[in-house]
Amino acid sequence: MFEIQTKTLLKFQKKPTIIYVKNQYYGRNGTMFQVNDVIIYGSQGVCEITAIEEKSISGAKKMYFVLNPIRDQGSTIYAPTDNAAVLKKMRRLLTVPEIHALIDAMPDEKTVWIDNVNERREYYKTLLAGGDPAALIQMIKTLYIHKKEREADGKRLHVMDENFFKDAEQILYHEFEYVLKLPGKDALMAYILERIGS
């Protein structure tokens, strides 16, 4: 009942907003986030919401999501709950069927190469920050093919592109490994290759 009312209210808001009710937040698209949820938070990847609490940071009291990245459990992220950009980076984990659909589509995924280094850098930074899995797959495939082409010419991948390649793999593969309950990248790669029949 309340979730439907919240979505209706949000539909008529001019600015993206969230509503807080008893340790639960409804994002601008109606997605509910609460303590103990495991989510994706942009380039930080898989995180657990360990608390939603008021803190005074830089002299201002605000409510924050307290996030612990699964791959770096020694770190803590404080993400303000009233920030639309923060909510845009937060999403639910993919389901197993959704991951299977992404894997099955990999062979047909188109690649998009940007020759201008500065434009490519900004584009890839945006993709990493957004954490959209389909966009990350396209980025990984594009860089992988470009890497193979350069190796065939006796050249190496540009350092910037190599770093983007590794970062995209880490974000995407960690989510896949977590959801599919696989022990690491090697197991995931074997899983992907078996699924697409390579």
Language model: regions and residue ranges:
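Charge/polar-rich, low-complexity and marginally structured segments
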Residues: 82-198
